[in-house]
Amino acid sequence: MSRLFTLVLIVLAMNVMMAIISDPVVEAVGCEECPMHCKGKNANPTCDDGVCNCNV
């Protein structure tokens, strides 16, 4: 039982580390989602080579 508990703790710790390490600002947004991604940022969304650019 303690091995299972240890395994669960390791998995949870890895999930927390991955959440901290991953940078949500650098997520790639496609052209279809670009207007919704830039909404609320007072931006002019454009799509360059399939990557969304909010042009604030």
From Swiss-Prot:
Record flagged with keyword Secreted: yes
Family statement: Belongs to the short scorpion toxin superfamily. Potassium channel inhibitor family. Alpha-KTx 09 subfamily.
Annotated localization: Secreted
GO CC terms of this entry: extracellular region
Protein purpose: Blocks small conductance calcium-activated potassium channels (KCNN, SK). Low toxicity by intracerebroventricular injection into mice.
UniProt comment concerning the protein's domains: Has the structural arrangement of an alpha-helix connected to a beta-sheet by disulfide bonds (CSalpha/beta).
Secretion signal span: 1-28
Keyword Heme among record annotations: no
Pfam families in the cross-refs: Toxin_6
Tissue-level expression: Expressed by the venom gland.
Name assigned to this protein: Potassium channel toxin alpha-KTx 9.2
